[in-house]
Amino acid sequence: MAMSRRLVESPLVVASHNAGKVREIAELIAPFGLEARSAASLDLPEPEETGSSFVENALLKAHAAARATGLPALADDSGLAVSALGGDPGIYSARWAGPTKDFALAMATINHLLGDNPDRSAHFVCALALAWPDGHAETFEGRVDGVLVWPPRGDQGFGYDPMFLGEGAAETFGEMDPAAKHAISHRARAFALLVAACLGG
């Protein structure tokens, strides 16, 4: 197996226009002396997410940002997959919240579609793509399993966090303080793989 490329350059462009995601990634990379610059702060356009998987979409975003800035770029594509809905919303998780990013509406939609179905199992997936301006890229994927609760609980986190209760957890992702979420989340799991491969553990 080929060695992964080491990330030594800073700043790192976080190829996301989602402020919650950018903040979470900035907190995860800070201990490695890396500074995060958000795509929005660099006036980068949001590329069309035309991939058919989380990894494909993360790669699209990372390559676009690395090419535009001449800096290494980290992109995340993540979402919620609900078992009883055939894995939806999946890669369309953000789109279910509509143009105004109304996740309260998206959560209510999921709850409505589930109806009386007792199967509330779901999982979060996070794909991370780290791309360099020369076209090289590394990808990592993390997953966390759990169940959906209704009504949503907590105002920490973002997106679908308030309705997701991780396996063995007493608090939803929306109730956990950020440090607790960072320890077990799908993003943290993908990031741990990236750290081991590209930041020297």
From Swiss-Prot:
Descriptive protein name: dITP/XTP pyrophosphatase
Task of the protein: Pyrophosphatase that catalyzes the hydrolysis of nucleoside triphosphates to their monophosphate derivatives, with a high preference for the non-canonical purine nucleotides XTP (xanthosine triphosphate), dITP (deoxyinosine triphosphate) and ITP. Seems to function as a house-cleaning enzyme that removes non-canonical purine nucleotides from the nucleotide pool, thus preventing their incorporation into DNA/RNA and avoiding chromosomal lesions.
GO BP: nucleotide metabolic process; purine nucleoside triphosphate catabolic process
HAMAP family: Non_canon_purine_NTPase
SUPFAM superfamilies: ITPase-like (SSF52972)
One example GO MF annotation: dITP diphosphatase activity
Short name of any one Pfam family annotated for the protein: Ham1p_like
